[in-house]
Regions:
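GNAT-family acyltransferases
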Residues: 1-114, 134, 161-214
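Conserved GNAT acetyl-CoA-binding A-motif
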Residues: 102, 131-145
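Conserved beta-strand-loop-alpha-helix junction that forms the acyl-donor binding cleft
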Residues: 110, 141-152
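Conserved acetyl-CoA-binding loop-helix of GNAT-fold acetyltransferases
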Residues: 116-130, 149-157
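Residue-level detector of family-conserved "landmark" positions at structurally sensitive sites
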Residues: 124, 141-142, 165
Length: 214
């Protein structure tokens, strides 16, 4: 059975901070998902704001899902840094009924101002390292629409290889097996990631104060 870590944990890399998806993030997330291009790229359906709040709650309560909002560190400032610096989200799902140690990865960089800066790559790598260390994941998958060339290129550069193609959904499935060498590399990456814990409901408190744990 998968056990959840404390939800009030944020992961800070060189260019991004991954913070838990909270209710305060929903209005901006909902605004992003009015973009038809993002809906197509993520294979999502448009939701009302009320439905978006319900979805956020269900995601945070699902023991087989981890969802983090990606913050662009260039914009982390002020009391609402965890909202103002929002640039996308990154998720892993343990939804393989035959093997709970297989996780599907998703990444979205929604803000045009933050694209082309390597934030997607860093976010995925941190999330994979998190999954290997805390959830004992031994294989990652990614399902990407064939027209989403940017995501396909990103995951292939990270070492994912095509395992199947759905002509019906026009979707490519990629896989990344965590070998011993890859595990060591991912865990080493975590040496450069700062884990913040925050006692309040505002991740900005710990980010701006420098509160962190090893």
């Amino acid at each position: 059975m998968v056990t959840r870590m404390a939800t009030k944990v944020s992961l800070e890399g060189k260019r991004v901070v991954l913070v838990p998806y909270m209710a305060e993030h929903v209005p901006k997330y909902h605004q992003w998902m009015q973009d038809s291009a993002l809906l197509e790229a993520t294979g999502s359906e448009p939701l009302s704001l009320e439905q978006e709040y319900e979805m956020q709650l269900s995601w945070t309560q699902d023991p087989n899902k981890r969802t983090f909002i990606v913050l662009d560190k260039d914009f982390v400032k002020g009391d609402l840094a965890h909202v103002e610096a929002m640039t996308g989200d990154v998720n892993i799902y343990m939804n393989d009924v035959d093997d709970p140690k297989v996780a599907e990865v998703e990444i979205m960089i929604a803000e045009p101002r933050s694209r082309g800066k390597g934030l997607g790559k860093e976010s995925v790598l941190i999330m994979m390292a998190y999954g290997v260390k805390n959830l004992e994941i031994h294989k990652f998958t990614a399902k990407i629409g064939e027209s989403n060339t940017a995501s396909l290129s990103l995951f292939r550069k990270l070492g994912f290889e095509e395992s199947s193609y759905s002509g019906i959904f026009k979707e490519v499935t990629l896989e990344f097996t965590v070998t011993n060498l890859r595990r060591e590399e991912l865990l080493k990456l975590l040496d450069e990631v700062i884990t913040h814990t925050h006692s309040s409901n505002n991740p900005s408190d710990s980010l701006l104060s420098g509160e962190a744990t090893a």
